[in-house]
């Protein structure tokens, strides 16, 4: 959502694995609270990711926040990471008070537009991929934040720019990792808002699960994906909603 204080919406599937039916949303369930840090900034967007970051068998939440410091001009753009640990169970989640920039993650200059999580180097822990936008010249950089810790005790490095064959300047910002072609490695899918449509980009991992290599430019609107009459930055999530495997 926009801003630091909007919170979470949750819609339970009250149907089943093959015929999903989602209930009306509830706000801030499971002990979740909006985060209001004592920072001289206005939060613009939070992108939430559900992942078992501490390898204890339940889903935690890591949020990437884009913010602008309006305390002085020219305004400074920063990115933060907010962590909500699930201290409950997989079936009865309960989230702790959120904390800022855990696991070696730190406030970064410019803006990390969006990050996604996955074991990109095949070493058994969760890494990050994303894009950074420099608002001084609107240049984009592809970034990799490696987990040099473990699956249960993550520790993230500083961002590495333009690795795995992805150059700067790719005009797709909302990114997700998925083995879309089921060949055993993680590929990249993007979405990008245009004037009157939203495009989807696919960049295949032509390397391996351990040594990824991507070959841009993206294939646009592959696999029948298209939103020709809808404008917006859709965040891609891959789930088997109809239970067909």
Task: Describe each PLM feature range.
Residues 1-3, 61-65, 128-133, 188-192:
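Hydrophobic beta-strand segments that make up the repeating blades of beta-propeller
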Residues 4-5, 66-72, 133-138, 193-197:
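Short glycine/acidic-enriched loop and turn motifs that connect beta-strands
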Residues 5, 43-45, 78, 112, ...:
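Short coil/loop residues immediately preceding or within conserved phosphate-binding loops
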Residues 7-10, 80-82, 141-144, 199-203:
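A short loop-to-beta-strand structural motif that recurs across blades of beta-propeller domains
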Residues 12-42, 85-110, 146-170, 204-231:
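Blade-edge motifs of beta-propeller repeat domains
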Residues 14-15, 52-58, 87, 118-121, ...:
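Calcium-coordinating acidic loop motifs
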Residues 41-46, 64, 68, 77, ...:
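Beta-propeller domains
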Residues 46-53, 64, 113-120, 173-180, ...:
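Beta-propeller blade termini
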């Amino acid at each position: 959502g926009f801003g630091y204080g909007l919170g979470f919406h949750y819609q339970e599937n009250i149907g089943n694995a093959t015929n999903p039916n989602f209930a009306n949303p509830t706000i801030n369930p499971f002990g979740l609270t909006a985060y209001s840090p004592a920072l001289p900034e206005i939060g613009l967007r939070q992108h939430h990711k559900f992942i078992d970051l501490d390898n204890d068998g339940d889903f935690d939440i890591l949020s990437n926040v884009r913010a602008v410091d309006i305390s002085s001009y020219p305004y400074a753009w920063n990115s933060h990471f907010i962590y909500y640990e699930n201290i409950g169970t997989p079936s009865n989640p309960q989230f702790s008070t959120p904390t800022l920039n855990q696991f070696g993650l730190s406030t970064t200059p410019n803006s990390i537009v969006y990050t996604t999580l996955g074991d990109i180097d095949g070493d058994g822990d969760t890494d990050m991929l994303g894009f950074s936008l420099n608002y001084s010249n609107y240049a984009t950089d592809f970034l990799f934040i490696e987990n040099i810790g473990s699956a249960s005790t993550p520790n993230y490095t500083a961002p590495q720019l333009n690795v795995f064959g992805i150059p700067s300047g790719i005009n797709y910002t909302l990114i997700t990792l998925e083995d879309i072609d089921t060949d055993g490695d993680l590929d990249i899918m993007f979405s990008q808002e245009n004037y009157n449509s939203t495009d989807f980009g696919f960049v295949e991992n032509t390397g391996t699960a351990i040594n990824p290599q991507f070959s841009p430019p993206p294939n646009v609107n592959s696999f029948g994906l298209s939103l020709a009459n809808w404008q917006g930055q859709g965040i891609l999530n891959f789930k088997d909603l109809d239970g067909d495997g």
